[in-house]
A protein has these predicted regions:
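Asp-based, Mg2+/Mn2+-dependent phosphohydrolase catalytic module
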Residues: 2-3, 7, 70-90, 101-130, ...
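Active-site neighborhood of HAD-like aspartate-dependent phosphohydrolases
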Residues: 1-54
Length: 178
């Protein structure tokens, strides 16, 4: 059986608007989760090309007590329901790391979440992509063996395979590289 190809997406800043700084940098309620239309279009391209889509996200706010694991999981369920009901788009899975820095091998930049999803779902990491807005996302993708796309970052210092100045450019890039 052939392994599936996948596009892994970071969450905050790629799927939804990035929260602020400090304690406010954690999305703690569904009411504060604002889906980016550019992500919806990117997901449409991914699925049209036969790729699976998985969200992999560090959620340190769980370890720090700013948000409960149950609330994070409820937000992810709401996201999946919204994508399916409103856009007829699906995600294969959503994986999050609830740990603080240095407590695990799943928190990006470690590749643990990507490798776990590949093992769980039979994904071909070498034929897959990681999309993120931080260099930790890019490092996780590279360490897992994926090609990488950096969005909204300092293009001059990123080690990503592709670098984009804005989310609005992601659907077109995916159309060209998938």
């Amino acid at each position: 059986m052939q392994a599936d190809r996948c596009v892994f997406f970071d969450r905050d800043g790629i799927v939804n608007t990035s929260p602020g700084a400090g304690v406010d940098r954690y999305v703690t309620r569904w009411d504060d989760f604002h889906l980016l239309p550019e992500f919806v279009e990117a997901l449409r391209v991914v699925r049209a090309h036969g790729y699976q889509a998985v969200i992999v996200t560090n959620q340190r706010g769980v370890a720090l007590g700013h948000v409960s694991a149950e609330d994070v999981e409820a937000m992810h369920k709401n996201l999946r329901d919204l994508l399916l009901k409103s856009y007829s788009l699906d995600l294969l899975d959503v994986q999050y790391c609830p740990h603080d820095v240095g407590e695990c091998d799943c928190r990006k930049p470690a590749p643990g979440m990507l490798k776990a999803m590949a093992a769980k779902h039979g994904l071909d990491l070498a034929a897959s992509f990681m999309v993120g807005d931080a260099e930790t996302d890019i490092e996780a993708g590279q360490r897992a063996g994926c090609r990488t796309i950096r969005v909204n970052g300092d293009e001059s210092v990123s080690k990503a395979d592709w670098r984009l100045a804005a989310m609005k450019d992601l659907p077109d890039l995916l159309e060209r590289v998938l």
